[in-house]
């Protein structure tokens, strides 16, 4: 059970990190 939770947390963190990178790149292109 804890393995599934830790895997879900890692997946969520990677998605958030990717979104932050994408947003920052978009802002750089807009400028």
Swiss-Prot record:
Q: Which InterPro entries match?
A: Cyt_b6/f_cplx_su6
- Keywords linked to the UniProt accession: Chloroplast, Electron transport, Membrane, Photosynthesis, Plastid, Thylakoid, Transmembrane, Transmembrane helix, Transport
Instruction: Say if the entry is tagged with keyword Disulfide bond.
Output: no
Q: Which GO terms describe its cellular component?
A: chloroplast thylakoid membrane; cytochrome b6f complex
Give the record's membrane topology: Single-pass membrane protein
Q: Provide the protein's localization.
A: Plastid, Chloroplast thylakoid membrane
Tree of life domain: Eukaryota
Q: Name one GO biological process term.
A: photosynthesis
Q: Which GO terms describe its molecular function?
A: electron transporter, transferring electrons within cytochrome b6/f complex of photosystem II activity
Bilayer-crossing residues are: 3-23
**Which HAMAP family does the entry link to?**
Cytb6_f_PetL
Describe the subunit structure: The 4 large subunits of the cytochrome b6-f complex are cytochrome b6, subunit IV (17 kDa polypeptide, PetD), cytochrome f and the Rieske protein, while the 4 small subunits are PetG, PetL, PetM and PetN. The complex functions as a dimer.
Q: What does this protein do?
A: Component of the cytochrome b6-f complex, which mediates electron transfer between photosystem II (PSII) and photosystem I (PSI), cyclic electron flow around PSI, and state transitions. PetL is important for photoautotrophic growth as well as for electron transfer efficiency and stability of the cytochrome b6-f complex.
Give the similarity note.
Answer: Belongs to the PetL family.
The name this protein goes by in its record: Cytochrome b6-f complex subunit 6
- The scientific name of the source species is Abies homolepis
